Structures are given as structure tokens and as C-alpha cells.
Amino acid sequence: MEITTINQLIAAGSGLIGACIGAGISGWINFRISRSNHDIEKLSFAAGFVAEVESLQKVMRERGYLEAFTSLSNDPDIVAGAKVHYTILIPDNFSRFYNANLNKVGLLGVDRTKLLVQYHQVLQALAQDFKEGSYVNMNGFDKEAIDECIRFFSLALSIGDQIVNYEVGN
């Protein structure tokens, strides 16, 4: 082989190796940027979901719904079979962030996603009892319906607390 051919092969090989190294570094940098953006997105949505749960928890606690129903459950007239009408105005869109970002719920991980979906399903079940035209809205809450609301308010508050106090390492 001639010297010029060897020099050309060395130059071509060096160029090819350099291109491979450059592509590898570029790919790694793009991967890191993409991963960083994904992590930021996860944190952002997690913060939004948790903030909404905290707000809903605060409203339920500040308004004393659980305590009110517990008091009603122990009322002698209710125990004797009377019914009571109890109204809570619940907007259809009480969980706006959750509804607007349902496609991002999975970013929270399996356990936290499960809790978040359960939480909102329990709240939806509660909200149905207070909707205009629902059976208990029209006929009143008897002891059984009141006790069911107590269970659902307790369950919602318990699940909500688990979401708010969830440790990411779990």
C-alpha cells in the first residue's frame, strides 16, 4: 500500500470515529435534557394534583361536614327513623386540575395514582348524593344514608391525607 492510501484510510477512520463519538455525546446530552424535562413535568403535575387534594381536604375539614353528619347520626329523631334534608352545593367541576389533566395522572407512579383515582371516585360518589334530583336529595337522609356519608367522608379524608403525606421514596 502506498503512503497516501494509508494516510487517507487513517483520515477516514479518524473522521468516522470522531463522528461516532460526536453522535454518542450528542445523543447522551439529548437524553439527559429529555429526562430532565420529564422529571420537571412529573414534579409539576404532582404538585398540582397534591395542591388540589389539599384544597379539597381543607374545605371538607373547615366546613365540618364529617362532624355535622356524625352529630346528625346520633340525633334521637334520626335514630328513631326520621329523615333530614341536608344540602351542600357542590359544583360539577370541583376538581378542575384532576379533570383537566387525567392523561397525566400516571406520572405520579402506581401507588399514588391509585390513591388519587380512589380519592376522586369517593368524592364523586359523595357529590352524587347531594345533586339535585338524587334519591337522598329528594327524600332526605335517613340513618343509613347518614352513616354511609360518614363512611365516605372519613374514607375521602383518609385517602386525601395519604396522598398529601405520601413519601416519594415509597
Per-range role (PLM):
Residues 1-36:
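Membrane-embedded hydrophobic alpha-helical segments
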Residues 32-54:
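Juxtamembrane membrane-water interface segments immediately C-terminal to a transmembrane helix
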Residues 47-170:
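Interfacial alpha-helical end/capping and short helix-turn segments at domain and membrane boundaries
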